[in-house]
Structures are given as C-alpha cells and as structure tokens.
Amino acid sequence: LRSAAVDVGVDLRLGVAVTGVAEHPDGVTAHTDTGSHTARWLVAAEGASSPIRKALGISFVDQGFDQDWLVLDVRLRRPVPTLSPFVQQICDPARPVTYVVGHGDYRRWEFQLQPGETRDEMVADARVWELLEPWLTPDDAELVRAVVYRFHATVADSMRASRVFLAGDAAHQMPPFLGQGLCSGIRDAANLAWKLQLVDDGIADDVLLDTYGSERLPHAAGVVAHAVDTGRLIDELSGRAPASTDLDAAYGGGRPFPILEHGIRVGDHSAVGRQVPQPTIDGRPLDDLLGSGFAVVVDGDGLVDAATARWGDLASIVVVPAGTMPLALPPGGAVIVRPDRYVAAVAHDAAEFAASSDALLHQLGIRRATPERTTT
C-alpha cells in the first residue's frame, strides 16, 4: 500500500504526530511535531483513538459491544494438512475461537479472553503455544505477532466538521466477525474522493460534501449492527449467553447487507444503491471499462447520443452488446454507475434516462456536463 501511494505521488510522512488543526477561509492547516501543512481539505483517518476527532468534539454512538480478544498471527514453517483451508468460527463453550486463512503461509487465530485474564499473561509465549496446541506446535510455525485487542462497536455522530472529514476507524469501529472493518474504511475513501475532486475542480458545489456523512453513516451503522449481532450469536452458540429470540436474523436470514439508502441516487429499482457486480465483457473485467469516474453502461448503442449529451466528459459511456450484460440492465436501457461503483440509476428507455440523469446532475449541483467524451 505504501509503494502504491508513493507511485501516484502521495507524500508519506511516517511517525509524525498531529498536534493541532486550524481552519481558515481557503483551507485547513495541520500542525505537527515536525512542521505545518496546509491544504483545502483534511481527512482524519488516524485510527480509533483519532486525536483530530477528539479535538473537534465529535462524539461516538456506542452500540454496547466490548470484548477483549487475543489475536495471534503465525507463519507456517511447513505444510500442516490438518489445518482447514477455510475461515472458521469455533463456538467452543470453553473459549470461542476464530481461525483465519491469510495470504500465503500466514494464519491467524483469535481467542476470546475469559474474565480475569490479563493482556500480559495472554501474550506470553508459553500461554500462546498452549492455546495453539490443538492446531500446531512451534515446529510447525513461527509466531509473528501476539496482541490483545478490545473489539468495539461505535459510530461517530458526524463525519464532517467544515473542511475536516473523518474516515476509517476514526469514524466507526466494529468487531471483526464480518471482516468489514477495512472494507468500511475503503468505502469511506471511495465515497469521499470523487466528491472532493468535483468540488475542488469547481464542477460541484461544496454542499455535495455533506452527502459523505449522510450516505456513509447509516451504511456504517448498519454494518456495525450486523457485526455485533454476529458476535452475540457466537456467544449464544457457545452457550456463553442466553439464546436470542431472533436467531434467524442473527444467522442472516431475511437480513440483506446494507445498501446505499439515501443520497446521490434516483429511483426505486432493486439495483439502485447496490454496488455494481464485476462481470466480464468481451474478455475484460467491467471495472477496466468503467474508468475512474461516473459511467453510463448502455445496452446496445440506442442511448449513446443521449448519454453523451447529458453526461459529456463527466462519465465514460460503455456500450455492451444488446442482451449480453449480466447486470440489472434493461434491454435498450442504461445503468448509471457512480465513481465508487454504486448503481445511481437504472433507466428502461430514453425518457427515463433523461429524467434520471437530470435528477442526478441536480443532486450533484451540476446543470449539464461538457459534451466531449469518448465511448468504449
């Protein structure tokens, strides 16, 4: 990740502490222990203890889930055939355990702490290998890391304070049972980046940035709640907590993953607000065709001129052979995809496409895009 950031021109300053933030009419200045840095916007993504969030006085809404778990990362020295190739949640009444298959030879175990157990005793080598004994020995693997984390379930009550935005764990924290912590931070970045660019380029009004929090906070809260229910289900199945009256919902029955309910989206089609799938078109992943901004995917070439007229250079126009797109793409219609790859609208015909496009451009604060565009 660091190499990728440097490759695109990011100036990384590691080990630098932010000591204060000051806003002024044209931007914001971050004061650090090595100097000051000024920009138009500041994104605070400095983790769960976020000093910037605290300095801004932004509070957390606590969903009432706090558990200590020992996290062990190991690197296998040799194949261990008895290890599962799949992630496992072991609901052991004596101690719930999570097993995760990492990249290459890396494996992770997570052990829930019992009342009275301390962090220091749990990370001691002897205790670590005692816990790992059912799966492997020091001859099988090298211990890379042993640390006790406290799993939280919290969501900030705001993700914006004028020119400062919160992202990642600074804005929301969740137990890891759905594997959605990093994913949620990536969704934050994907949601905010294109909006900052439109505003910074003078294409959209600053009010567009308010949709960052109005879109991300409800979604993040829904994911946190789902993760909490999964954690409670683990305790219930382990016999460590009373059985829920709604086990079906806890297992996921009738509970779809949260979608983008409000914000830059139009219409009530079932695909709107969901992330676009990744089909292969003419041997290429759809993402390779969509570009990095808005995209209009049209079924056949019937709406190409309309898409170009409405969206101009704001969107890539992607034409797929009629009837071949494994997406919620109506015959002869179009799907409008946001830069963060959420479906913004689905149109069945030219009239619906025009109305949906105009509504979206109005939401973005854009009257009409520049009519210069290349078509794929």
Question: Where are the regions that the model predicts?
Answer:
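Core Rossmann-like FAD-binding/catalytic domain of the broad FAD-dependent monooxygenase superfamily
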Residues: L1-P242, V318, T370-T376
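Helical substrate-recognition/capping region of FAD-dependent monooxygenase/halogenase enzymes
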Residues: R2-G9, E130, L198-T376
